[in-house]
Amino acid sequence: MPNIDVNGHNFHYLEIEGEQPTVLMLCSTGLDSRQWRDMLPLIEGRRIVCPHYLCYPKSGNWKGEGDIDSWTDYLAAESLLLREDGQVDILGHSYGGFIGLMLAVNHPEKIRRMAFHEPTVWGCLQHTDREDLKNEFGEVVETFFTEGLEPEDFLRDFVDYWNVPGAWDSMLDNRRDMWR
């Protein structure tokens, strides 16, 4: 699997050769291309590109000052989109849905079709005056990305945050395996 450089940050991405149009798969927070493993047989034969975001497996770490700039993830996805010949189909989940929506706004001529599940607008908090929301989000990001959690602890915190405390531990083993 190849890598690209975006503003001095190394991004790993899954690339599967196949027929056009390309499917650009944008994963959720905390997940990488493995999130789509059950989807791949359904689109077998298509060209697939799926970036691993900053600080995710096989991608580099944040090198900037202060908090991680999520716009860098967008720039990586945009770079991959613009490398493709012709239009692409975008499939995005959660954070990946947010990135996909931004790509569609900024590059409508490159998008043939798009499908998003639970797109979250994390980036909107950068433009709000609500310090309480910024602080809560900052704590979540810090917990998820900068405390050096083991993968299992990260998944527990992430799933519990978006659901209820204990949600991760109450999942059936085969459901947890889908996240790993």
Predicted regions and their residues:
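Active-site loop/oxyanion-hole signature of alpha/beta-hydrolase fold enzymes
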Residues: 49-91
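Gly/Ala-rich beta-loop-alpha elbow adjacent to hydrolase catalytic centers
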Residues: 92, 96, 100
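Short "lid" loop at the C-terminus of a central beta-strand within the Rossmann-like core
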Residues: 55, 118-123, 160-161
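Conserved alpha/beta-hydrolase catalytic His-Asp/Glu region
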Residues: 148-180
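Conserved HGGG/HGGXW glycine-rich cap/lid loop of the alpha/beta-hydrolase fold
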Residues: 6-64
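Short, hydrophobic/aromatic-rich segments at coil-to-beta transitions
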Residues: 1-2
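Flexible "cap/lid" loop of the alpha/beta hydrolase fold
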Residues: 101, 105-106, 110-145
